[in-house]
């Protein structure tokens, strides 16, 4: 091949060509008789020298010659400018509002250790890095509003951080990031918050919805009874009996204020409802524990007064053991802040039509795909329902408990919540953690949020 043919080749292409030629030469050499090989090597050894006078060993000869030839041809290539490390010349503090479907992720928060599924923040950081909006997630003043667990979704999650800024050519952040993010994570707005803003501590209230159906195999929930019980959550209470204790945070104040608590109908035709809950802040697994108790009350396994009993820590000082409601129906629906004006993806007059259409089509595709799957599952349910009607329902002596997401838990005999075994007290759990870690009281930074 003439040397001019190599002029447009990249470094990787040249190396690949070298290896290809070397392989062919070795193959041809191996096919020669031993005496012929020895003769050729002797001739080559006597004739070929490197510029510095060092002999080329026969076993390396083919590679050296081909490499030398390729490098000579490559000398005619235009010299490329060295790539400079990417640096942020100017940054701006931005808050991003975004939505995500949680069932494909191992929760919101980025994890240093490997996880079975990716995390939402992991995907967001990947997009930010690919877009050259940040250089290092650990040095961009990052904060999140509400940490959601594996399987939990969000429609109004908020993060804040420093990102690249350009005055000469404004960056359309929503469009840039949504092009790089998975279809089930969408940036829905951004804002330039006031000084001192923190996505977590500046949040005034958080809004959750927990979806469920009224009917389930073997029973139906009493919605009026659940609404009556939900109203008992209103106000400020000690919710230590409605959460999972996280000893690493050394929380001592379990008081939280609930602003709104009710059961609402989402779709009368399908019997879909939601536990609609708003509060200033929430404890770990608090909403799922509150929902679990509402399920028991809706099934008439417990009285509505159970909520008052569990909120009275003098009467019930430690949490009775009970199962939380399933995680998948839970949604962090919105987060509310003062003095924040969100810029929507469609606020730019030049790009609004294109962005609006692309966003709608992306979300529509997800919705349509799930709708088709729902209908397929519905056909299967019809078959199962036909078999149940044909053979009749079996008489069972066990109790059935609805734990959300269409899941049922059966037990031979239902044990009332207040008659169950209790967990250890908050004080005992916190103290044991300190001893295990070798911490003193002065070393502990308690995380108490109201």
Curated annotation (Swiss-Prot):
Catalyzed reactions per annotation: a uridine in tRNA = a pseudouridine in tRNA
For this UniProt entry, the molecular function terms from Gene Ontology, in alphabetical order, are: lyase activity; pseudouridine synthase activity; RNA binding; tRNA pseudouridine synthase activity
- Listed GO CC annotations: cytoplasm; cytosol; nucleus
Which E.C. number(s) belong to this protein? Answer: 5.4.99.-
Q: Where is the active site?
A: 149 (nucleophile)
Residues the entry annotates as binding substrate: 208
Give the Gene3D superfamilies listed for this entry.
Pseudouridine synthase I, catalytic domain, C-terminal subdomain, Pseudouridine synthase I, catalytic domain, N-terminal subdomain
Q: Which Pfam families match?
A: PseudoU_synth_1
Q: Name one GO biological process term.
A: mRNA pseudouridine synthesis
Q: Where is this gene product found?
A: Cytoplasm; Nucleus
Q: Would the keyword Nucleus be found if you checked this record's keyword annotation?
A: yes
Q: Which UniProt keywords apply?
A: Cytoplasm, Isomerase, Lyase, Nucleus, tRNA processing
Q: What HAMAP family is this protein classified in?
A: TruA
Similarity annotation = Belongs to the tRNA pseudouridine synthase TruA family.
Q: What is this protein called?
A: Putative tRNA pseudouridine synthase C25B8.05
Identify the species of origin: Schizosaccharomyces pombe (strain 972 / ATCC 24843)
- Which lineage do the record's taxonomy fields give for this organism? Eukaryota, Fungi, Dikarya, Ascomycota, Taphrinomycotina
